[in-house]
Amino acid sequence: MSQEGLSYAAAGVDIEAYERALERVKPLIAATHGKEVAEGVGPFAGLYALPGGGHLAASADGVGTKIKVAIATGNHRVIGADIVSHCVNDIATASARPLFFLDYFATGKLDPAVFGQLIEGMSEACRDAGCALLGGETAEMPGVYALGDYDLAGFIVGLVEQDARREAPSAGDVLVGLRSSGLHTNGYSLARKVFEGAALSPDLSAALMAPHLCYLAEMQKLPWKAAAHITGGGIPGNLPRALPVGLAAVVHKDAWKPNPIFAEIRRRGKVSDDEMWGTFNMGLGMILVMEASAVPEGVTVVGEVVEQSGPERVTFR
């Protein structure tokens, strides 16, 4: 297959088709919600009101086909930490303190060494985030997974204190970007297609297996109003989820330099600019909305919030 104009859809992941499917089932999901559900499908975490005040925040995630790179490199500990960090970041956008985490591990035949590495990574990441690895499910499914293959998913619950809700974003606020280590856990189907047949050099392996950073500690120190975890769909697909209706974002591409791995993916795969920005985090793992006067020294301002004047919620300049 020619690599001319590689895209995420051509690599087997059609985000637009997923979004259409999700829209169709949203009424079924909403039909299960009572008055306790403060946030449902859409934000990065669901919120469930507690009788005494405050909310539980919950999220579920996977690590995608980064697992294939882990299998090729033998580095499974990173994957274990990645799934925890991904989940923690999602509920951190709701100002939640992680309480407990559960995992689901499925494989064709259990490899104790691989399983041990995954649990080591999860345990370390849970300790760093201050949450309990409460339990999980381990499933051997021969005939469903090929020998050596596996999948991993995570589920997290956190607590949003009664006084933790934040002021809503408004026009004039600024966007602060928190740097990523690389792809984190998204875009790997496209990246793997780009590097298909290429030797995994130590440098390339390290870049592709860079850990999904956890932003909890950093976010707890900053005065933000809203936060967007930049995962599947990139900045255009995630930043609008942090903005109220009627607001949009202007993002300045020259405010930071994406990690070298993104330039390599673009070059090798002849991937278009729109495809790159709509698939990968491009060097920012989290974007915070802050009041301009509250921005501390040393952070990277990458854009601003404006009144929405057209169909686009995110404009790049």
Q: How would you label these PLM feature ranges?
A:
Residues 2-12, 114-132, 145-150, 197-208, ...:
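Glycine-/charge-enriched secondary-structure boundary and capping motifs
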Residues 2-35:
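N-terminal amphipathic/basic leader segments beginning at the initiator methionine
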Residues 63-66, 161-164, 183-185, 233-237, ...:
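Short, acidic Gly/Pro/Ser/Thr-rich loop/turn segments
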Residues 175-183, 227-232:
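A structural signal for small-residue-enriched, beta-sheet-centric alpha/beta enzyme cores
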Residues 188-198:
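Short, compositionally biased
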